[in-house]
Amino acid sequence: MTKAQNVDPSEIKKFEEMASRWWDLEGEFKPLHQINPLRLNYVLEKADGLFGKKVLDVGCGGGILAESMAKEGATVTGLDMGKEPLEVARLHALETGTKLTYIQSTIEDHAAENAGTYDVVTCMEMLEHVPDPLSVIRSCAALVKPGGHVFFSTLNRNIKSYLFAIVGAEKLLKIVPEGTHDHEKFIKPAEMMKMIDQTDLTEMGITGLHYNPLNDSYKLGRNVDVNYIVHTKKY
């Protein structure tokens, strides 16, 4: 596999078709808007703030997390392979007066040219959409400076996550479009830790992300059965 091949064209196409609705708070990306404050606060807490830091958001899509980190005073670069989502992200940043940079590139190509550049790297809800997640994790490790932080979020692979993320979220509640996720691409925490151990990163903590359908809200917690976030640091 070459560096340029760690892309699933069907995944890119799927998100490009929804690109115009990235910033619709009641559209397909509503869950990302709902969980963004939780993700942002987790990053802020674990990375000791973002002000003045160089940050890379891998798989940034329409820029929901990237823009919020820029508003915290970080110098943010958003990276994605989808042309349409990036155009939406650039337009929204222009409309809101948010200063950040968006680049269409694979993480592997970006890492080859920018090793040790960033204080913080975020890779949220992206690993389950690529053929080779280890390649992405290795590239994130290469891109962050020694002493820097890398954050990964994805979905666990088990019966509960299938029932919650696919049967519940996609088929019954229609929270996200059907076909958004492939359960076979979900990553168990033990598998995630094994991949992290093959890099210069050290796992610093893991937290679960929980959805309550009764009040349509999310919270962080200890249970990592479905969604989870991993905090790592490069020593």
Curated annotation (Swiss-Prot):
The keyword Methyltransferase applies. GO terms for molecular function: 2-polyprenyl-6-hydroxyphenol methylase activity; 3-demethylubiquinol 3-O-methyltransferase activity; polyprenyldihydroxybenzoate methyltransferase activity. It catalyses: a 3-demethylubiquinol + S-adenosyl-L-methionine = a ubiquinol + S-adenosyl-L-homocysteine + H(+); a 3-(all-trans-polyprenyl)benzene-1,2-diol + S-adenosyl-L-methionine = a 2-methoxy-6-(all-trans-polyprenyl)phenol + S-adenosyl-L-homocysteine + H(+). Its EC number is 2.1.1.222, 2.1.1.64. Pathway: Cofactor biosynthesis; ubiquinone biosynthesis. Gene3D superfamilies: Vaccinia Virus protein VP39 (3.40.50.150). InterPro entries: SAM-dependent_MTases_sf, UbiG_MeTrfase. GO terms for biological process: methylation. Keywords: Methyltransferase, S-adenosyl-L-methionine, Transferase, Ubiquinone biosynthesis. S-adenosyl-L-methionine binds at R39, G59, D80, M124. O-methyltransferase that catalyzes the 2 O-methylation steps in the ubiquinone biosynthetic pathway. PANTHER family: METHYLTRANSFERASE, UBIQUINONE BIOSYNTHESIS O-METHYLTRANSFERASE, MITOCHONDRIAL. Belongs to the methyltransferase superfamily. UbiG/COQ3 family. This is Ubiquinone biosynthesis O-methyltransferase. The gene is ubiG.
